[in-house]
Amino acid sequence: MLAQTRLEKEDALAQYLKEITSSKPLPRERETELAERIQAGDEAARQELAEANLLFVVSVAKQYQNRGLTLAELISAGNLGLMIAVDRFDGQLGNKFISYAVWWIRQAIMKALAEDGRLV
């Protein structure tokens, strides 16, 4: 029973990774445009900016493996940080979104590790 649950989780993670591999980073101009639309409450812009950066969250999450949480849990925490960054990003400051978002992604992962991770 436990092995089956683990396999289902691994299959779900594999499917998720397969789905997001086609996402491409956005040009800075597009990020700025989306940030303005997000500030105006455009949910589609919020989704587009987030989806374009899901693969980056996975790459950051992989750096924190073997610290007490599964890769899926790390990705989930990183995605929460990504959404905070999406909501707070100001494209007028001239920064690339990912340079801003990486701090929120790492912070969310570190918080999850502190709260839920276990010492090895």
Spans of features found by a protein language model:
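Alpha-helical promoter-recognition and RNA polymerase-docking modules of transcription initiation factors
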Residues: 2-120
